[in-house]
Amino acid sequence: MFDVRVINKRENKNWSLKKICYQLFLATLCPFLLSCNNDQETKHIKPEYWSTSWATSLKVATPGFDPPVPKIKNTTIRQTIKLSGGGEEIRVWFSNEFGTVPLKVAGATVSRGLGRGSIEKASLRKLFFEKKGSATVLPGERIASDPLKFPVQNLSELVISIYLPGDLSGSSSPISYHVRGLQTNYLAPGKQVESADLKNAVTSVSYFFLAALDVKSQDKRPVIAAVGDSIMDGDQVADAEPVDENARFNNFLADIIFKNG
């Protein structure tokens, strides 16, 4: 039997978040109008702009508070992200900002997902870094993949797979991650970035070393950054956490903005 009190509490919280999102949407109308006026003056030039469509904050694990970080040694990590705005090209940012040793990325791909860690193989594209298939992220740094022509729609989902050959769990270097991702992501042994289905994978609701994704389009968009506590991640009461539901504050806000033109 469902716990009605929990459901009502969750619905009330979601309704409050939606009210806040509508207020923020009204506040963004002015920048959108100014942007439209500027575009009218130079519409014959058809410029293109990069803007961040997805991003998350990273941290290191807090002993005794955060759950243990999964073992990462010779590991493929497959992570699903929910975009806000779409575009014709993408670039993906990877981070080693809290690490104390270089992070070797020995393969990375982007694709559309089919759920439960599976991907649409026909959509898979390799990511390159200065035209190379691998890269090293220095301690305290971030790197972006080369721009890739990969059209994406507003509010769509993408799957990013990376292969990390090193023994990160066996080193003393902190792992840069976002603990409360509330998205089922997958860690599998060996190099499986191009596999449609992962073998022997374990799951986590965290994001690892993945910092942001930018899109390139002809729209000059303002970017809104949501800063706050775990409510921004979509945290609810423990027995009703919305994993894989995209029920974060910024998801509600993006829905309102893009569905209202």
Positions of the model-derived regions?
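Signal peptide-proximal N-terminal region
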Residues: 252-261
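Bacterial N-terminal signal peptides that target proteins for export
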Residues: 4-24
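N-terminal secretory targeting modules
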Residues: 29, 36-227, 232-242, 246, ...
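Intrinsically disordered, low-complexity serine/threonine-rich segments
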Residues: 5, 19, 35-41
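Bacterial N-terminal signal peptides
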Residues: 23-32
